[in-house]
């Protein structure tokens, strides 16, 4: 079940550095709730998504699980206050927060024992492989 937060709860979470957010949340609803427009384009210079801190661009034509994961990642950048390209540390923080937003740790832990590969787990969770990895890492597991 997806958790729903109202705008006041999101603002409170943002002020707290988004540390108290825990998924799963609907990234499309989150974008709408915090007033972040999402556009689809084929021109992202090889990237799956991008943000300037106010707007998100997603590569058109992605598989639904990759699109959801990319949107969660770009929203994480916004929640963390990122407004431009990030170094590896900034990307790491966005990856970890995106996994917390999109994945429920109890579900990740439970399904991990049932799946034989990271790819299979990603399919079950409805996320891409990268975000699933960070979800495992957040649960103190390694793939």
Question: What do these predicted regions represent?
Answer:
Residues 1-143:
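Active-site hotspot residues in diverse enzymes, especially metal/ion-binding acidic/histidine motifs
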